[in-house]
Amino acid sequence: MKTKVYLTWKQVENFVNIIKNKYILEEPFTGVYGLPRGGLILAVMLSHKLHIPLLAAPSDGCLIVDDICDSGESLLHYFQNSSGRSKKRYTLVTLVYKENLLNVVPDYYLIPETDDHWVVFPWE
């Protein structure tokens, strides 16, 4: 049985601040898009912190966020249009990353997940 690891709102807020401090100077994002449902809360938080629009659909140069990248399926399309090209279209960010068979790796993540634990987000 997997051990549950509970993230707090403070940890999520710290992550948002890390992203803000890391990327605000590096890349002028056109907006932030959150994958439904897990990425929406992070997208709203980042939209406020970065003072950029919350997008209803992703656009070139935007930040794409999700709560977790585990199977890689939800981020696969964006990953193929991000890291695999010389001109980067998207920056992918998740709270949690787990190695997956699709080899999808976000540009930035906070927690590497292992097979022996399960992350529970504060909004769950």
Specify the residue positions occupied by each region the protein language model found:
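PRPP-associated nucleotide enzymes
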Residues: 1-124
